[in-house]
Amino acid sequence: MPKRTDIQKIMVIGSGPIIIGQAAEFDYAGTQACLSLKEEGYEVVLVNSNPATIMTDKEIADKVYIEPITLEFVTRILRKEGPDALLPTLGGQTGLNMAMELSKNGILDELGVELLGTKLSAIDQAEDRDLFKQLMEELEQPIPESEIVNTVEEAVAFAATIGYPVIVRPAFTLGGTGGGMCANEKELREITENGLKLSPVTQCLIERSIAGFKEIEYEVMRDSADNALVVCNMENFDPVGIHTGDSIVFAPAQTMSDYENQMLRDASLSIIRALKIEGGCNVQLALDPNSFKYYVIEVNPRVSRSSALASKATGYPIAKLAAKIAVGLTLDEVINPVTGSTYAMFEPALDYVVAKIPRFPFDKFEKGERRLGTQMKATGEVMAIGRNIEESLLKACRSLEIGVHHNEIPELAAVSDDALIEKVVKAQDDRLFYVSEAIRRGYTPEEIAELTKIDIFYLDKLLHIFEIEQELGAHPQDLEVLKTAKLNGFSDRKIAELWGTTDDQVRQLRLENKIVPVYKMVDTCAAEFDSETPYFYSTYGWENESIRSDKESVLVLGSGPIRIGQGVEFDYATVHSVKAIQAAGYEAIIMNSNPETVSTDFSVSDKLYFEPLTFEDVMNVIDLEQPKGVIVQFGGQTAINLAEPLAKAGVTILGTQVADLDRAEDRDLFEQALKELDIPQPPGQTATNEEEAALAARKIGFPVLVRPSYVLGGRAMEIVENEEDLRSYMRTAVKASPDHPVLVDSYIVGQECEVDAISDGKDVLIPGIMEHIERAGVHSGDSMAVYPPQTLSQKVQETIADYTKRLAIGLHCLGMMNIQFVIKDEKVYVIEVNPRASRTVPFLSKVTNIPMAQVATKLILGQSLSELGYQNGLYPESTRVHIKAPVFSFTKLAKVDSLLGPEMKSTGEVMGSDATLEKALYKAFEASYLHLPTFGNVVFTIADDAKEEALNLARRFQNIGYGILATEGTAAFFASHGLQAQPVGKIGDDDKDIPSFVRKGRIQAIINTVGTKRTADEDGEQIRRSAIEHGVPLFTALDTANAMLKVLESRSFVTEAI
C-alpha cells in the first residue's frame, strides 16, 4: 500500500529526560523516525523536553518544541499546530502515557487528531494487565497465573492461594518501577503498597513467580497489510527474575532448539497480529529449560531498549521502518537501507554473536542496593560483536569502563568461598565476575547451573576462557596459544599479565607475527547479498572487509556507555563533530561501544567501528585506517584518558595537545598556570596521605572541599567541616586514586557559574555564561542553570569573559573548553577547567543557536573563528530566559540518599524557556516532574546554619496560603521569630512523624537541609526516602525552594484585609 496522502502534518512525542529505564535509545529512535517521515515528505512537529539530544536539533523536524511533556503544554502545542496525526510509539513510556492521557481527556477527538502506528486499544491491551490477560487467553497463549489487585489485602489473599514466591508488577510504569519479587507476606505488603502508589491507575498484577526459566525476547515488526517478521531474537544470560534491562543479553539466542525457536516465534507473531500493531513490538517470553513449556511475560507495543539493541545488533533500522509503516507503507515496498538492494521483508540473518552488558551506577552510589530484581537499575549498556561467545563477552567486559579488562575483578581472589557463593546465588550487578571467579576456583558448570539457573552452555564458555588463561600461563610467548587467546577475545593486557610482561611487548609480538584483527561488516544478511553499510566489528580471522578509502580521514572517539556524570550530552557533541568533519571534506570515522545512541547509527558517519574504547582496540583501527588524526575532546573522560597513551604511540591528537590537557588536569601545573595568568582560585593544597591532608586543612581553615584529581562527575568529592571527618574521608575515599593525590581546597560558599568557550588559539568565542541557582557545593550537573545570568553584575561578567580568554590562550586550548567559577563579594575565583566539551554543550548550543561542537571541530581542522564569522569574546545574549534543570532516578535506586552535594547524582536534564525567569522556572519544574499544587502543607526540617534563611522562605509560603509544618528545633526557631509552625515529629513518632504524614498525603513539599557534618543524620535520610517513594517534591537546597517560590508567587494572588 503506498503511503498516505490524506495526512500532511505529523506530531511526534519524544521521551523527555533520561532516567533509568528510559535512556538514549529513544533519542536514537526518535531521531531516526523524524528524519524518516521528513524523507517521505511529511511536515513533522516534535515535542520533547530534553535539550541534550540530537532529536531536539532544529534540522531533525520542521518545528521543534522543547517544552514540558505534560497535558497542559502538549495540548497547547496541538491547538497551535493543528497536526493531522500523532505518533506516540517512539517516545518510550512517556510518549505512550501522554497519548493515553490526551485520548482520555478527549483532546484527540476534539481536535480530530489520529493516532498512528499503534491503536490506543492495542496500547491498552498490552499495558493494562487485565486486558492483556484476556487477550492471551483468547489466543491460547500461556501466561503465569495472576490476579489484578487494587489493595494490599487483595494481594495477600491471592498469594495465599498460589503460594510464594510471587512477582508484583504495577500497571503503566516504566522499567519495572515499584515492582519486585516477594518471598513472603511481609515483603508482599511492603512492595504492593509502594507499587499501588506508583501506578497511575492504582493497580498491580500479582503473579506466580517463574524465576529460573530462560528469558527470551523477540523483536517483531508488522505492517498494515499484516506482513510480519522477526527482526531478531535475544536470550538473557540471567534467567527470569532479573529485569531484561539489567541482564546480560546475547543475540541471536544461543541455547534454544529449532523447535523451541519456531514455537516462540509463532507465539510472538500471533501476538503482534492480534494486537494489530503497525510498527515495532517487543515480546518477552519465559521458557522452561526442562520441557517445551513457555509463558508470555509481557509485550511492549512500541520501540524499546531492546529494539535499539536489535537494530544495532542486526543493522536492521527498526525505528526508521516503524515510522514508514505508520504512514501506510508496507514492508514489501520499503528497501532495507543496509543492503540497498533487498526489501525490508527479509528477516535479518546473523553470522556473528552480539553481547550486551548493562552499565550500573554503583561506582557512584556505594550505599545503593545492588541486588538485582524486576526493577531496572542500570543507567546504560555496552554492546560487543564477535565470532563466538567468548570473544563478544570479553570485548563487552572491557567496554564497560569499570576498571576491568577481562571477565575478572582481581580483588575477588581474596573473597571467602561462602561469601563468593552467596554473591553467585543472589544476583548483583557484578555477578558475572563472581561466577567467573567460582569457575577459576574449580566449581563445575553443573554446580553453578544448579545454584543460579544460568544455562550450562554459558558456564561452559566461562570455563573455556579459564582453560585458555591456564594455557597462556603455562606457555609464555607461545604464538599458537596467543592466536587461540585472541580468537576468543582476550586483551593484550590480560595476556601480558599471564606472561608477566607488558601490554606493549604483547602488541609488538603480535605485529611482528601478523596476528592482527580483521574487520567484518554488519550487513543484516550473513553476507548473502552485497551490502553497502560501512559498519564494522573486529575479530581474529580471515578476510578483512573494511577497505581503506583514498580520502583523508579523521577518527572521533565516542564516550562509551551512559553513566551518571557522562550522559547523552557527549554523544550529541560526537555526532555534531562528525558533521563538521564531513563538511570539511574528510572521511569521518566513529568508534564507540554504546548501542543506544545516535553516534552508533551507521548512517551518521562514513565508517562506524563498534568496538571497546581501549588503547589496544583504538590502535588496531588506527593501524588499519591511518587517519590524519584523532579527536578526543567530545568523548568525555573516556576519550580524554586515551589521549596520552595514543600520543605516546605516535598518534596525532587533533585539538588541545596532551601537555596542555595535563596542565588543566594536574593540580600543581594548573596552579602554576593560574599564577602566571594572574587569575585567583580558592586557596588549596595537595596531599598524598592522611597527615598531609590534616596539615593542609589546618593551614587553609575549615570547611574544606576534598577530592581526588582526574575524575568526572565529582566522584568521591566531599565537603568536610572538621579534622575528624577529614581523617575518616582520607581512610575511606583515597582508594579512588592510589597514585593520584587528593586535593584539599578552601570551600567558598558563593554564587557558582560556568562557561563553555571555543578557541582557535588566537581568538576565544564565549557563547554564554550560565548561572547556577544552587550555591557552590552542589555539583554543576545537579544544579539548575540559568542563561542569560540574572544576578551577575556587568563587572563580574566582564571579569569572567576576561579570565576565560586568558585561560583559553594561556592553556593553548584548541577547540572546546569548560570553566567553572565561584563568585563571592564581587570577586571571581576559578574552581576548575576542563579542556574538552562539557555536558552543557547541547543546552547552550540550542539557546544561542551556535552549533558549538561543529564550530570547535572546524577550528581543530584549521579554520579560524573570524573565517567562520564569529567575534572574539562574549556572544550577545538571548532575550528569552532558558533554564536547564536536572532529573534524578532515585525511585529506582533504593538506599541512595537524595541529598545533593559535590558528587553528581542526576541521570538526565530538561529545559524550560520563556520570556521571564518565573515562567521559564515553572516550565523547568513541570518538565522535571516537580509539580507543586497551589495550596497545602510544606514541612521544614533545617540545619542550624540555614534557619535564618529558611524563616524568610516559610513566611513567603505562608503569605500565599500554604500551611507550615516544622520539626522541633526548626519550629522553636520560627516561633521565636513570630512564625507559628505546626510541630511534627522527625522519625519514630508513631503516626505523627513526617513519613506517616507523607503516607497519608498530608504533605505537599519537604524542605530539608543538613549541616556539612559527615555523619549526615539518619533521620533526614529516612525523611528524604519517604518523599522520593511517595513522589512528594523534596528540596535539599534552599536556593531551589526559593526558585519554586518565585514561580508560585508569580502564579498566585495575595489576599489581604484592608
Swiss-Prot record:
Residues that bind Mn(2+) 3: 820, 832
Residues that hold ATP 2 according to the record: 707, 746, 748, 752, 777-780, 820, 832
Binding, Mg(2+) 2: 298, 300
Stretches for region Carbamoyl phosphate synthetic domain: 547-929
EC number: 6.3.4.16, 6.3.5.5
Residues reported in the UniProt entry to bind ATP 1: 129, 169, 175-176, 208, 210, 215, 241-243, 284, 298
Boundaries of every MGS-like domain copy: 930-1058
Stretches the record annotates as Carboxyphosphate synthetic domain: 1-401
Signal peptide (from-to): none
Residues the entry annotates as binding Mg(2+) 3: 820, 832
Key words of the record: Amino-acid biosynthesis, Arginine biosynthesis, ATP-binding, Ligase, Magnesium, Manganese, Metal-binding, Nucleotide-binding, Pyrimidine biosynthesis, Repeat
Region of interest (Oligomerization domain), ranges: 402-546
Enzymatic class: ligase
CDD domains documented for this protein: MGS_CPS_II (cd01424)
Binding residues for Mn(2+) 1: 284, 298
Domain ATP-grasp, chain residue ranges per copy: 133-327, 671-861
Allosteric domain: annotated segments: 930-1058
Binding site for Mn(2+) 4: 832, 834
Entry annotated with the keyword Secreted: no
Binding site for Mn(2+) 2: 298, 300
Pathway: Amino-acid biosynthesis; L-arginine biosynthesis; carbamoyl phosphate from bicarbonate: step 1/1; Pyrimidine metabolism; UMP biosynthesis via de novo pathway; (S)-dihydroorotate from bicarbonate: step 1/3
UniProt xrefs under NCBIfam families: CPSaseII_lrg, PRK05294.1, PRK12815.1
Family: Belongs to the CarB family.
Subunit structure and binding partners: Composed of two chains; the small (or glutamine) chain promotes the hydrolysis of glutamine to ammonia, which is used by the large (or ammonia) chain to synthesize carbamoyl phosphate. Tetramer of heterodimers (alpha,beta)4.
Name of the protein this chain belongs to: Carbamoyl phosphate synthase large chain
Organism: Streptococcus pneumoniae (strain 70585)
Lineage per the UniProt record: Bacteria, Bacillati, Bacillota, Bacilli, Lactobacillales
Gene: carB
